[in-house]
Amino acid sequence: MTMTGRGGGNFYVLALVFSGITMHEAATTGQFILICSSLTATIFFWKNKVVDWKLVLLIGGLTLVSAFFGGYYSDKFGGNLMKIIFAIFIFLASVLMLKPFKKQSELSNSYSIRLSLGTIVRHINLYIFIPVVLVTGFVSGMVGISGGSFLVPLIVLVIGVPMHIAVATSTTLVLITATAGFLGHLSTGHFNIEIAVILAIVALTGSLTGTQLTLKTNPEALKIIFAVTSMIAAFIMMYKIFY
């Protein structure tokens, strides 16, 4: 999952729920695992100079706040409702990733900001950008996923960043979102440190492999892998709810 810029929160939470752990505890544990796996991935991408730090600062500030409150208020939502939100959220993300990329000329308007990313100038539509980032942060913090499920489509489709840079940048943002969400969840007391540490060590191995594969994989293949794995996670969670 690190290979597609999501960190793996979708499947961490799924695996924990299927093992009998409550949704609230699974969300907290998932966030902790994400912190560990995305930290190592961020260091790797940073060394390879594929992280767009301007986007990290722009998006990170919004997700930091909204993810914390998502985790903090997660106790107000029932377990099944959180599972439904989880499934709908990542299914929509998979559908969005299958959409064709739009040229920047189609995206810019009077309600956009101009952002220079290296030698390329991008126009970011604030009417789309701000609500999507805030909702992504809140839901990610609440249900324990990385946020990369929506951040990658946002960075690729709305801003027009190449897939490899989007994955690397999203991974860095996952670290920010997961940390904020974890701190919010931690205040509710839903955390089993023994399970979390063991799973985090296992996840680190996959994270190191995934980051290296990212830079070697065709961008279109990354998009398809992203979409298919998101759909699978959504359908598995819906199955868990009704069966």
What do these predicted ranges mean?
Residues T2, L14-F18, M23, I43-F138, ...:
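Juxtamembrane transmembrane-helix boundary motif
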Residues M1-N10, S140-G147:
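Short helix-coil transition sites and intra-membrane helix breaks within transmembrane domains
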Residues F11-E25, F150-I165:
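Interfacial segments of multi-pass membrane proteins
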Residues G30-L34, S170-V174, I195-A196, A200:
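Short hydrophobic/aromatic, small-residue-rich stretches within specific transmembrane helices
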